[in-house]
Structure formats: structure tokens, C-alpha cells
Design a protein with these regions (language model features):
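Bacterial N-terminal signal peptides that target proteins for export
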Residues: 2-14
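Sec/Tat signal peptide C-region and signal peptidase I cleavage site
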Residues: 22-28
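Flexible loop/hinge segments that line or gate small-molecule binding clefts
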Residues: 61, 99-139, 150, 157, ...
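Short, solvent-exposed amphipathic alpha-helices that sit
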Residues: 43-60, 140-144, 168-187, 200, ...
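Hydrophobic alpha-helical
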Residues: 81, 93-109, 177, 190, ...
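Hinge/cleft segment of the Venus flytrap/periplasmic-binding protein
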Residues: 30, 161, 165, 181, ...
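Extracytoplasmic "Venus flytrap"
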Residues: 31-54, 58, 63-80, 86-88, ...
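Hydrophobic alpha-helical segments within soluble ligand-binding/sensing domains
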Residues: 32, 74-76, 132-158, 200-202, ...
Length: 323
């Protein structure tokens, strides 16, 4: 009887250990990686909020990797490869430079790990994404061109804060912007890339206003640059006289528009992009069909006239939220 009890206890302990091991494995299997060039600022914070908020609802643990800036491409590639080694269920990726990610994305595909673009329709220049949620960067450029023509119907001069050097999203926007203004009376008099930092953008915009005191419009690749341009116009007491045009409507961009120092914003919906991207991951992980492989999230032109009538919940994270 005593031996039987010991055997029963041993079997029970063994079963408990097996259950715990299975539970641990199940928990590990629920991890999803997120690889971003940066995790701070008016673009990355809301997209990460959308991902994180819906990931909790879907039962996933998110591992966020921050490369610390667009200049750290090698670091981002290394972080992505590390997520593959960790055998996460899927990876959400916004690549600093898609040309650098071909090998890493192939590595993920070989490991049967889906790679989904989050804020980027492209994950690697030669390897297709399993899915993506984004706005077309070329479409943003076209919409910015519409904005420039609306603000300067008779033509004028433009100084361009072009975005981070080497960032494909910024170059795509600017390329398509230039295509649309090529045969107009709009003339680009200055163009400069710079670090994606508000203080750097402000300094660059101030420099433009000093070098080109009669410039008609400042173009910002996104609202980090646009807010810098707006604050420069504000400091020079040129709000309204120098038009300010950019993409993405974060909190600071909204404030600068209310102050009359930003005139036209092509607003993206990064919270919605994040929610859509993690939803696509969930379907891929569960082997369910996607409605579309690429979900293009609509752009919303914003001026002071419609600023109060549009919902910001798909554009901005809750105040104080950080990744």
C-alpha cells in the first residue's frame, strides 16, 4: 500500500511537472516581436499603442525592440534576427532600410515566422511581407502636393525638411511630392535631411527662414519636422505668412495648428495601423485567411477648419502612454 502511494505521488508529481512545462511552452508560443527604428515620438508611440492594446485583448505578449534611430540599421537587423532566434510567433516590422533586411527576413521565413509590415508596406527590398498594414508613402507625397497647391494656388517657393537620411519612407514621400509639383509654379529652393529630433528640426527650419526670408512654405516629412517648422515660424512671427505643411497629426502638431502656425497636415492613423497589423498577425498565427494581404489605411487631410470635427482616437495614443 505504501509503495502504491509512493508511485501514485511520483506519477502525480510527474504529471504536474509536465503540465507546468506545457504551460510554459504555451506562454512562450504567445510572444510576438516588434522591430522598430525608434519607439519614441508622435508616429511610433501611437502605432505601438495600437499594437500593444489589441495584443493584450488577443492574448499575446509583445517584445518591443528599439534600434534607437534611423542611423542604427545594423542594430535593428541584429534585433530582428534575435527575435527569430527567440522563436516568437510572428514579427511586426518597420524597417529603417528595407535593403538591409533581405537576409534577416529570409531567416524568419525559413523558421516559419510570419513577418508583417507595421507602418510600412515593405519589410525587405527583395522579400515580400506575409502581410502589411500601412499608408502608402507615395500617396502621402501626392496628398502633400495637393496641400501645397491648395496653400499656394498661384505658386511660390518651398524649403524642405526632408526627414532622416536614408529613410525610405521619407524619400518616397518626397519623390512623389516632387512628381506632382514638377509642372507647377511651385519651386523648391532648399532641401535638407536631418536627424528625426524636434530640436534639430527647429534649428533646421530656423536656418531656412534666415537664409530664405521670403520663402512661402515649409515642408516637413512628418510632424517631428513639421512641428519644428511651425515653431520656427512662430518664433519669427511669421505664422500664416509662411505656410507649414507636413504629415502625421500628433498632439504637438495639433497644438501648433491651433496656434495658427501649421496650415495643412496629411494625417495618418497610426493607432489604427497598429491595431490592424496585430490583427493580421493573429490571423496568420491561427492559420486563418486574410481579407487583404496589404491593408492601406486611409489618409485624412486636416486644416484648422476641420481640426475639431475629426476623431483623433485612430491618430494619437492616450495622453501619457509610453511603450
Amino acid at each position: 500500500m505504501q509503495e502504491w502511494s509512493k508511485g501514485r505521488i511520483a506519477r502525480t508529481a510527474g504529471c504536474a511537472a509536465a503540465i507546468m512545462l506545457l504551460a510554459a511552452n504555451a506562454q512562450a508560443a504567445d510572444k510576438v516581436g516588434v522591430s522598430m527604428p525608434n519607439i519614441k515620438g508622435p508616429w511610433f508611440t501611437p502605432i505601438l499603442f495600437g499594437i500593444s492594446d489589441d495584443a493584450k485583448k488577443l492574448g499575446y505578449e509583445i517584445i518591443i525592440q528599439d534600434a534607437g534611430g534611423y542611423g542604427n540599421v545594423d542594430k535593428q537587423v541584429s534585433q530582428f534576427s534575435n527575435l527569430v532566434v527567440q522563436q516568437v510567433k510572428a514579427i511586426l516590422l518597420d524597417p529603417a532600410n528595407p535593403d538591409s533586411f533581405n537576409g534577416a527576413v529570409r531567416q524568419a521565413k525559413a523558421a516559419k515566422i510570419p513577418v508583417v509590415g507595421a507602418g510600412s508596406p515593405v519589410v525587405a527590398s527583395s522579400v515580400e511581407a506575409d502581410a502589411a498594414a500601412s499608408s502608402s508613402h507615395c500617396s502621402i507625397g501626392h496628398e502633400l502636393a495637393k496641400g501645397a497647391k491648395t496653400l499656394l494656388p498661384n505658386g511660390g517657393t518651398i524649403a524642405i525638411l526632408a526627414g532622416p537620411p536614408g529613410a525610405f519612407w521619407a524619400s518616397d514621400r518626397l519623390r512623389c511630392f516632387k512628381e506632382d509639383i514638377a509642372n507647377s509654379n511651385l519651386k523648391i529652393v532648399a532641401e535638407q535631411t536631418s536627424e528625426q529630433d524636434a530640436a534639430v528640426a527647429l534649428s533646421l527650419a530656423n536656418d531656412f527662414l534666415q537664409r530664405f526670408p521670403n520663402v512661402d512654405l515649409l515642408y516637413g516629412a512628418d510632424d517631428t519636422y513639421g512641428v519644428g517648422a511651425g515653431r520656427a515660424a512662430q518664433g519669427a512671427q511669421k505664422c500664416g505668412k509662411v505656410k507649414v505643411l507636413f504629415a502625421v497629426l500628433g498632439e504637438a502638431a495639433e497644438e501648433i495648428m491651433r496656434a495658427g502656425c501649421a496650415d495643412y497636415v496629411v494625417a495618418q492613423q497610426p493607432v489604427l495601423i497598429g491595431r490592424t497589423a496585430i490583427g493580421m498577425v493573429d490571423k496568420l498565427v491561427k492559420g486563418q485567411p486574410l481579407a487583404k494581404k496589404l491593408e492601406e489605411i486611409a489618409l485624412i487631410p486636416v486644416t484648422k477648419a476641420n481640426l475639431d470635427s475629426i476623431s483623433k482616437t485612430t491618430m494619437q495614443a492616450p495622453k501619457g502612454w509610453t511603450p
